[in-house]
Amino acid sequence: MPTITLPDGSQRAFDHAVSVADVAASIGAGLAKATVAGKVDGKLVDACELITHDATLQIITPKDEEGLEIIRHSCAHLVGHAVKQLYPTAKMVIGPVIDEGFYYDIAYERSFTPEDLAAIEKRMQQLIEKDYDVIKKMTPRAEVIDVFKARGEDYKLRLVEDMPDEQAMGLYYHEEYVDMCRGPHVPNTRFLKAFKLTKLSGAYWRGDAKNEQLQRVYGTAWADKKQLAAYIQRIEEAEKRDHRKIGKQLDLFHLQEEAPGMVFWHANGWTVYQVLEQYMRQVQRENGYSEIKTPQVVDRILWERSGHWSNYAENMFTTSSESRDYAVKPMNCPCHVQVFNQGLKSYRDLPLRLAEFGACHRNEPSGALHGIMRVRGFVQDDAHIFCTEDQVKKEAADFIKLTLDVYKDFGFTDVAMKLSTRPAKRVGSEELWDRAEGALADALNESGLEWEYQPGEGAFYGPKIEFTLRDCLGRNWQCGTLQYDPNLPERLDASYIAEDNARKRPVMLHRAILGSFERFIGMLIEHYAGVFPAWLAPTQAVIMNITDKQADFALQVEKSLNGSGFRAKSDLRNEKIGFKIREHTLLKVPYLLVIGDREVETQTVAVRTREGADLGSMPVAQFVELLTHAVSRRGRQESE
């Protein structure tokens, strides 16, 4: 006779075992209809799950985060149902939930086309309209093997082999289609109406390029059609903002097959890049960093000592010369320790902050490359702080403040901070971990802002702080990091003379604010849709004449603005002024200066913005003041 305790503290007693769905029905017909699953004593279970003992129960509906995840997982199974009806010889692999959606990996004799994707989606809609129940059966292992052998589902059999300790497994039946899963899943296909298949891509069995290639069908699913429509609108906006499209439109960069994952920066894009670098150089100089430069290619011996050769070799580009093996550096840390090790260091020299705009190369899989967001060659705003354990808290607190200030300059004010703590497999004493985590937590608390723990997500040698930016589309981008590391100084024999004249190891704090310049510029392009703030715009002002008579004055204005440190160009083409204005508006130039006879006579410029605002005529000196103010704000709003 189980007694069920609900989230509000109320209780319901039953004289027999009762399912989650039964409890929901006892509360109300509306809740019963909306029940996706339940959480019994904190564990997610199917709506059909019987409760035989006193328990706490939360009814899960599509409004709950868990409910939405269950809907997405069930949609992946529905993909399987549709695919097997349309392509009976296809073999289903895995279909997990991902951020805002799901995918299913499939083995088939030919590549799916966009027409196939549309056909699969249409069949899924037809299956949903049948409004059938999804049936779960806990099935003995031997019977599961028989089921998948009979259906020729080779990959499912391999997955069963991966779970030797599982003596019974959950099989979920969508009519004639059967799939294996721990669940839970929706009780009926009526919950799956708000879905859409989004794209096709390639994948490899177990994610290993050495294995056979599979096809991946991606989709998204939501609680209702309104949420789905909002998501589609957001994705369409993201496609308009795709940095690859805008990069071409604004002539910022290009990529080509002969150099996969390497960026060809054009003059406009390189201007943005240089503004970022000069800005970060100034910020670091003002905050006590010394800029250094270390080699690109380093002997294998150093990478062996640092541990990278044994743990990271497959991601490193290597070469040989005169019977010596070398690697192109994938990161800067070991080289920075070499700089620290030159000359005896005293505790009075600490903290020592070494910064480098370090060019790194990593042998990323070609399938993982994406525009300038995921590349093989990139530059980081990388720095390492060598300090004593007692200095960690202050250095971390100063870095947090600096990082948040930098993000504000780029227009990012919604920043999530997370502290990743000790993983199960780790080195170092518990006392060391306590002190390290405590110092970083205290530094985060000093910021006065909200932050959260990520238990078990730290590196094996130390905790770290991560900074995640939310852009104008609500997407999250993990950028900044502060990693506590007592391990590399030990491996590379870094030391300093302490106050008691003993030789001690420094703590090394790895830190980056932007991360990779390439990725950060890609983010900025999409965040601003190419409409860069004046300080970042490749061209800040363009001067246009109406007729040839104003050409000389236009050139004078261009020279004056460039002489004042701005990026200005003149457009003296024999084109109508309306054509010129439209063209430079599409190129997203912040300020458009028009010069006609009246402007020449009064020595003024008629100022328009790319948004179409007419600021009227003004002397060049007044425009310089206006542009100076716009540039000085960087990406901040007027109110900041």
UniProtKB/Swiss-Prot annotation:
Enzyme class: ligase
One GO term of the biological process aspect: threonyl-tRNA aminoacylation
Domain TGS: 1-61
PROSITE patterns according to UniProt: AA_TRNA_LIGASE_II, TGS
Details of cofactor binding: Binds 1 zinc ion per subunit.
Listed SMART domains: tRNA_SAD
Family: Belongs to the class-II aminoacyl-tRNA synthetase family.
Protein name as it appears in the record: Threonine--tRNA ligase
Record gene name: thrS
